[in-house]
A protein has these predicted regions:
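Hydrophobic h-region of N-terminal signal peptides that target proteins for export
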Residues: 9-20
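Mature, soluble, non-transmembrane domains
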Residues: 103-269
Length: 269
């Protein structure tokens, strides 16, 4: 199982809509944990149970934002065999959305499956650029015009939601291997006013925040495939916090329920 990195990985390109400045949203400096559990599985998937914990830390800094994600899952197959998976990723993205550093690690049963470290730079906002990898080997990946990085992508989706946009055609680079450059179809659904159905364990940071149900279908970049690689859904708050997470791999679905949410003091600039 490869865990999809950066749940905020969506970017608005050539949709005909006009969006507000993506830096206008104030992202909350926070740490959140989620309980992960199997929702459903098709018989052919061979999976009978999934449990685990997902951690997110988002810290706005003086010239950018640091985002850290880590997940530990235990998957049980028919017959009782259990497999543990661990995914961790850290990125730093500049406030002008043109540069990013990243490091990701994916392990299965304690063995390293893949690891990526590198930097990505764009010629300008929504312009093309390149990724320079230092791990696993020194290599370069071209980035197409219109691509944005995860933090800028989150802000762009929030701006689209504020504008009343519901369907978007997207491109995103998440900070990983070549397969994390994806085209994305995003649906922005139900809107919640500030204070409406606020999770009790997140009230301090969420009570005064509007939010939207969102769902993202990720496809291999430039692919004509009819089926996405995976789909992600969650409730997105205007300060960047997410709740009600659903990961859909086709053969099975895993939910993420918010357990804890706390403020992280941001540096004084």
């Amino acid at each position: 199982l490869k865990f999809p990195w950066a749940f905020f990985a969506v970017v608005v390109v050539a949709t005909g809509a006009t969006f507000t400045n993506p830096l206008s949203q104030t992202l909350a400096s926070h740490r959140a944990t989620y309980a992960m559990n199997l929702v459903s599985a098709l018989p052919q998937s061979g999976i009978v149970d999934v449990t685990g914990v997902f951690l997110v830390e988002q810290i706005p800094e003086c010239k950018g934002v640091t985002l850290h994600q880590a997940v530990q899952l235990t998957m049980r197959a028919e017959g009782g065999a259990a497999i543990s998976t661990r995914f961790a990723a850290t990125l730093w993205e500049s406030d002008d959305a043109t540069s990013m550093t990243f490091s990701t690690v994916n392990e299965v049963a304690g063995d390293l499956v893949e690891a990526f470290t590198g930097t990505a730079a764009l010629s300008g906002p929504r312009l093309g650029g390149a990724v320079e990898y230092t791990e696993p080997t020194a290599s370069t990946l071209a980035l197409p015009s219109g691509v944005l990085f995860p933090i800028a992508l989150s802000r762009a989706v929030l701006a689209a939601a504020e504008a009343g946009t519901r369907l978007l055609d997207l491109i995103g680079f998440d900070g990983g291997g070549e397969d994390t450059l994806t085209t994305v179809s995003v649906f922005i659904g139900a809107h919640f006013a500030a204070g409406e159905e606020t999770p009790a364990n997140g009230a301090d940071l969420l009570a005064d925040q509007r939010s939207w149900h969102t769902r993202y279908a990720h496809y291999a970049f430039a692919s004509q495939a009819a089926e996405p690689i995976f789909e992600v859904g969650y409730r997105l708050f205007e300060n960047g916090v997410i709740t009600d997470l659903i990961l859909d791999y086709g053969g099975f679905q895993v939910s993420g329920t918010l357990e804890t949410l706390e403020n992280i003091p941001a540096p004084i600039c």
